[in-house]
Structure formats: C-alpha cells, structure tokens
C-alpha cells in the first residue's frame, strides 16, 4: 500500500498505525550515482541508435544537471518497432505458439529479475525522477513486483466459455490477444506504469511497442534488458524513448498498431483519441488527469484525517493523477483542520531524495517547476489565502516548498485545474448534499475520498461521488487486484485487476454444427 511509505521517512506517534512489515524492513543503502547501462532504443531484443542519430538529455531534477544522452526515437523508429512486433505476433511464431502457462512463467521470471536488481532500479528511479529513494524502493518497486506477479498468475486463467445456444450447435468463446499494443507511459511513476501496462498485455499474449517519457526514460530501458534476459522472444516488447509529438503521435496514428494505452494529461489524451480514431479506429485506454475531492466530515478522526489528507496531496511531490487536490472540510472543524494541516506541511522534510529523512524531493523538471509556481501565483491573485510555502525550496534543482491555501473558492483556477505539485487547497462546506454537488462539479472523475465514522454517510457518499475509485477513511490504497480508472475526462477503460485484462483481448465466438445436441 502506498500509505505505508510515509512510515519509513517519518515515524512520529501519529503514524504508528501506518507501520507495516514493508515499512519496517531494512532498505539497502543506495548508490547516489548509479551507472547508466541502457540509453538506446530497444527493438527485437537488440539495442539501436535512432534512425536520425538524434539524442536528447535526461536531467537529474535534484541538480538540473544532465545525467546522460538518450536516443531520440521518432516515426522511423516506431515503424521499425511495429514491424518487429508484427513479426513476433504472426501465426506460428514462438510467441503465438507458446503455452499460456509459459507466458506466465516468463512474467514471473521478469519479476524475479527486477527483484534481483531492486536496489539499482530504485536508485536509478530516484536519480532520474527525483522521488525519495525509500519510496522508490519500498513503494514503487514493491508494487511493480506485485503487479507483474499478479498478471503472471492470470496468464492461463483468463479464458472463454461454452454457451448453450438453441439447436444442434456447439458454441464457445475465445479470449484472443488484440495484437500490437502501443503503450505510452508517464514520468511520475515510470517503473510502476510500465508494469501496469506490460503485465496485462503480455499475460494475454499481445506484443508491445512502448514509448517512455522523455523526462524519465532510464529505468524502463533497463527493464528492457531484463525482458530479454527473462527469455521473451524478440519483438514481443519494443521500447522507444522519445517525445510525444513525434514518437508518441506515431504510435497513436500507426495503422499497424491495434490498440493504444496512454497515461498522462487529459489534453494529450484528447490527441491520442483523435489520432486513434482517424487512423484505424484502434482501441484506446486512457488514464488521464484528476482533481479529486477529499471530503472530511466533522465526525472524522482528526489526527488520521489530517495525516491522510496531507499524504493524499503531497505524496510523490504532488505528482499523482489521483491526488486529493480539493480538500473539502465541514465548517465546524474547518479551522482546526486548517491549522493542523499547515503545521504538518511546515514540518514536511524537503531535500536530497537519497537522504532517508527526506519526505519530498524535487519536481520532475523545470517545466513542471515553473508551471506549479504559476498556479501558486494565480491562487494568490484570485484571493485564496496562502498559509505556508509558496516558493522554491532550494537554490538549485526543482524543489518547491509544501504549500497550503485556505479560503479557496470553487471558481478559482487552483480549485479547477490539475496543479500536479505540492499545493494543497482547502475548501469549506456545510452539508453533505452541498459537498456532493460541489465535488462532482468538475470535468474530472478519477478518485475521491471520504473521512467519517458514520457508515451511512460513507456509503451514501461512495455512491454519489462521480469517481472511478472512492476511498473511505484512507487514501492512495492500491492493489494489483483492484481496477483503477476514471469517469468523465479522467479517462476511459480500467487498469489492474481482472478488469484490466479486458482491454487487451478480443472475444471471439465460435459456433459448430453438431449431428445431435444432448444436454
């Protein structure tokens, strides 16, 4: 569970209830400068330079310094990757002939290799992304392993049915792989989003062309090496680093791609959907932005609600699509909640992500850094009350002070738009009917949460809120077994759980004439 991560970096009395075996286990000391082994394009189980020979820098967000140059894939490289994937998916190929149980064993093997290299991958993730190393190790890598192993178990268990149709006929269904799956992953959880995409696609027998985020390409590329080591046939997984308008657009519009799965902003999701529809009507799964309401009722456990609301917003430097970024607090506990939330934000440790005491590292890059500061300025200009933070937290790197706004109104920019940073907005409400209307008055619908001791209130709100996930008295609790996805402009389709397999299969009906049917 994500919430367990907090205990590793901050073990005060109020967090005692969060302690778990994962959080108390020893975390190996990291290498602060892990060597980069993979920075090219991975096609057909081989490493390639870009056709154009272009490269781009990937930057350490803690310092602003370049880590290394990475091959910059574009349309020509995507064409090569799709060609390799289509060859791997041909009838009679080793991948198509492989038993489903063997596909599962390959996924188990991949998870084992990632676990073997867990310390290295966690350090590389922290170097390239900026998230605290203990979070990379205890949370991200733990969830990667659980996701891959969960879908490995599904490989030979997701199947069709026999159907008793009328007449002398025998009818059954097959769950067949869609084919070539384009997958475009974001920079906020590079390894985890790679696992969310690869797990169900490979378990069901598909082949993959993946574009990794230009801000954080290094860990996903290293996993490509492990995919080859695990024994996946050439062409089954191909990984192209590059930029959205070139490599990403080429995947979304490619006639040889049968499905595209994208995690990222709603704005880019629109472009993906249009490109998919105007090309070959490929299937689309979108996990997009959010402005999730976190509702604190007056009867909530105040200690727990304050800590969880802090976690809901500030976890991962606020760079979560499902962040609890609209904190609605019932009026008779509003002042106390605000006071305690400000105190908690002021105590949040911001700094070197390799330091085990650090709770918050830098934002991912300069673009995000400047965008977040712009939202903070907007909040001040529109009349929200800046209660703490509001500026840069270091002389170099992309660190931002934990920021809290009070007296936030629904019409303010910071209450409507996804900030994607460590900026908490606290809003006041009176009645449960009022907060339902205000919480649902958003173009987004990814997640929501309710804190209350009253089960009737919790049940009512969980049904009334327009969100794909509703947490009750907790936040950011994920499991590979539970589906995740959004309502409205937060996306379409579901990832994780059994539901996550549906997007990667076609259901084929086969009907056979028989001489005589007997029950």
Curated annotation (Swiss-Prot):
Keyword Ubl conjugation appears in the UniProt entry: yes
Residue interval of the organelle targeting sequence: 1-19
Chemical reaction(s) catalysed: an aldehyde + NAD(+) + H2O = a carboxylate + NADH + 2 H(+)
Domain of life: Eukaryota
Associated pathway: Alcohol metabolism; ethanol degradation; acetate from ethanol: step 2/2
Span(s) of short sequence motif SIFI-degron: 12-26
List of residues binding NAD(+): 264-269
Induction of synthesis: By retinoic acid; 3-5 fold increase.
EC class (word): oxidoreductase
Pfam families tied to this protein: Aldedh
E.C. designation(s): 1.2.1.3
InterPro entries hit by this protein: Ald_DH/histidinol_DH (IPR016161), Ald_DH_C (IPR016163), Ald_DH_CS_CYS (IPR016160), Ald_DH_CS_GLU (IPR029510), Ald_DH_N (IPR016162), Aldehyde_DH_dom (IPR015590)
Subcellular location: Mitochondrion matrix
PTM description: In response to mitochondrial stress, the precursor protein is ubiquitinated by the SIFI complex in the cytoplasm before mitochondrial import, leading to its degradation. Within the SIFI complex, UBR4 initiates ubiquitin chain that are further elongated or branched by KCMF1.
Molecular function per GO: aldehyde dehydrogenase (NAD+) activity; carboxylesterase activity; NAD binding; phenylacetaldehyde dehydrogenase (NAD+) activity
Alphabetical keyword list: Acetylation, Mitochondrion, NAD, Oxidoreductase, Transit peptide, Ubl conjugation
GO CC, one annotated term: mitochondrion
A biological-process GO annotation: ethanol catabolic process
Subunit comment: Homotetramer.
Family as reported in the entry's similarity comment: Belongs to the aldehyde dehydrogenase family.
Function text: Required for clearance of cellular formaldehyde, a cytotoxic and carcinogenic metabolite that induces DNA damage.
Official protein name in the record: Aldehyde dehydrogenase, mitochondrial
Organism: Mus musculus (Mouse)
């Amino acid at each position: 569970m994500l919430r367990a991560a907090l205990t590793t970096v901050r073990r005060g009395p109020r967090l005692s209830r969060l302690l778990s075996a994962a959080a108390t286990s020893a975390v190996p000391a990291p290498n602060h400068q892990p060597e980069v082994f993979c920075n090219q394009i991975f096609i057909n189980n081989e490493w390639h330079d870009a056709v154009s020979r272009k490269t781009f820098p990937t930057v350490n967000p803690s310092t602003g310094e370049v880590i290394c140059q990475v091959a910059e894939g574009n349309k020509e490289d995507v064409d090569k990757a799709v060609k390799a994937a289509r060859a791997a998916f041909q009838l009679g190929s080793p991948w198509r002939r492989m038993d489903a149980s063997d596909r599962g064993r390959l996924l188990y093997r991949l998870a084992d290799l990632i676990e073997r290299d867990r310390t290295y991958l966690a350090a590389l993730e922290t170097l390239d992304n900026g998230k605290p190393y203990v979070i990379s190790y205890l949370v991200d890598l733990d969830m990667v392993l659980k996701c891959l192993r969960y879908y490995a178990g599904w490989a030979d268990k997701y199947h069709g049915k026999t159907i008793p149709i009328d007449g002398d006929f025998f009818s059954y269904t097959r769950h067949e792989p869609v084919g070539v799956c384009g997958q475009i992953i974001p920079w906020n959880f590079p390894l985890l989003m790679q696992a969310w995409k690869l797990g169900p696609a490979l378990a069901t027998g598909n082949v993959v062309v993946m574009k990794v985020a230009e801000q954080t390409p290094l860990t996903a590329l290293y996993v490509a090496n492990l995919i080859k080591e695990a024994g996946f046939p050439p062409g089954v997984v191909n990984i192209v680093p590059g930029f959205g308008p070139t490599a990403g657009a080429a995947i979304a519009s490619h006639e040889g791609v049968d499905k595209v799965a994208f995690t990222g902003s709603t704005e880019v999701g629109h472009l993906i959907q249009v490109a998919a529809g105007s090309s070959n009507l490929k299937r689309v799964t979108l996990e997009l932005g959010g402005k999730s309401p976190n509702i604190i009722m007056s009867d909530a456990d105040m200690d727990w609600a304050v800590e969880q609301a802090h976690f809901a917003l500030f976890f991962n430097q606020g760079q979560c699509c499902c962040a609890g970024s609209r904190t609605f607090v019932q009026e008779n506990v509003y002042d106390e909640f605000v006071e305690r939330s400000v105190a908690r934000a002021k105590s949040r440790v911001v700094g070197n992500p390799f330091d085990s005491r650090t709770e918050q590292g830098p934002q991912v890059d300069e673009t995000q850094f400047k965008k977040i500061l712009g939202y903070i300025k907007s909040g001040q200009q529109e009349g929200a009350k800046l209660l703490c933070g509001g500026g840069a937290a270091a002389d170099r790197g992309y660190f931002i002070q934990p920021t809290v706004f009070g007296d936030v109104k629904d019409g303010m920019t910071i209450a409507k738009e996804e900030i994607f940073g460590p900026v908490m907005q606290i809003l006041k409400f009176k009645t449960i009917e009022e907060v339902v209307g205000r919480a649902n008055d958003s173009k987004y619908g990814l997640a929501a949460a309710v804190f209350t001791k009253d089960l009737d209130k919790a049940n009512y709100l969980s049904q009334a809120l327009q969100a794909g996930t509703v947490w009750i008295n907790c936040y950011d609790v994920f499991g590979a077994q539970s589906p995740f996805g959004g309502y409205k402009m937060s996306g379409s389709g579901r990832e994780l759980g059994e539901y996550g397999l549906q997007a990667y299969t076609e259901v084929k009906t086969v009907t056979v004439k028989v001489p005589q049917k007997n029950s």
